[in-house]
Curated annotation (Swiss-Prot):
It comes from Xanthomonas oryzae pv. oryzae (strain KACC10331 / KXO85). HAMAP family: Leu_Phe_trans (MF_00688). This is Leucyl/phenylalanyl-tRNA--protein transferase. Belongs to the L/F-transferase family. GO terms for cellular component: cytoplasm. The gene is aat. One of its GO terms (molecular function) is leucyl-tRNA--protein transferase activity. It comes from the Bacteria.
Length: 250
């Protein structure tokens, strides 16, 4: 009989190391540790080791590193031919880091199949807003005029982007945000977007399952490549969403 295992309880110090991701449980898949806090130092340390927080309001903070791990190759995000035809006629525009708090708010408010309530608690929102103000968390935003119709946010460490959540205020808004993020990262030589856990929507857009060992190897390599933290807004500017039809996206 396999002995019952519990996740490791983290020390209270933000600088306390995480246990190796390979020590995560298989049931529930990927649960590694419990406790700690959501300070910028701890969050950045977690992502740099392939670990992310995911828990419900009123519960202890849970830290995860599932096996396999869902990822997007930045040259592998798929948009259907039908959606591309709609996009070519669209007047939507795309920006970066101009509405981070609106994006995370909208992600928290979006209903998710099979989930009762949101995992993006008020504590989580404040933690990622703090990371954004430090230049480590970023959003891609899709606008119809002045109205936000889609977005995605996540954390950048080195040349690795860790996606956290996305939303659609109108049909296709999250697809455009993800495709725009992938196109931008691909152009800058960033090969991967972490998508955390499997779901049918991600698979339909080209997400792949990576064995955790391979994912951790890729993360280690990419986070070691220095990138200056800071806002992406000025560098990114504003683009027509229809321009995505002319990129490398399949």
């Amino acid at each position: 009989m396999t002995p019952f295992r519990r996740p490791i309880v983290l020390a209270t110090s933000a600088s306390a190391p995480f246990p190796p991701a390979e020590a995560a449980l298989t049931d529930p898949d990927g649960l590694l540790a419990v406790g700690g806090d959501l300070s910028p130092q701890r969050l950045l340390n977690a992502y740099a080791h392939g670990i992310f927080p995911w828990y419900s309001d009123g519960r202890p903070i849970l830290w995860w590193s599932p096996d396999p791990r869902m990822v997007f190759r930045t040259d592998g995000v798929r948009l259907s031919s039908r959606f591309k035809r709609q996009l070519r006629a669209s007047t939507w525009t795309v920006r970066a880091d101009t509405a981070f708090e609106q994006v995370i708010d909208a992600c928290a408010a979006s209903p998710r199949p099979g989930q009762d309530g949101t995992w993006i608690t008020a504590e989580m929102q404040q933690a990622y807003i703090a990371l954004h103000r430090l230049g480590h968390a970023h959003s891609i935003e899709v606008f119809d005029g002045a109205r936000l119709v889609g977005g995605i946010y996540g954390v950048a460490v080195g040349r690795m982007f860790f996606g956290e959540s996305m939303f659609s205020g109108e049909s296709g808004g999250s697809k455009v945000a993800l495709a725009a993020l992938a196109a931008d990262l691909h152009g800058r030589g960033w090969p991967l977007i972490d998508a955390q856990v499997e779901n049918p929507h991600l698979l339909s857009m080209g997400a792949e399952r990576l064995p955790r060992a391979e994912f951790l190897h890729d993360v280690q390599r990419q986070v070691a490549l220095a990138e200056q933290p800071g806002s992406w807004s000025q560098r990114y500017g504003e683009h027509a969403a229809s321009d995505l039809c002319e990129t490398h996206l399949t």
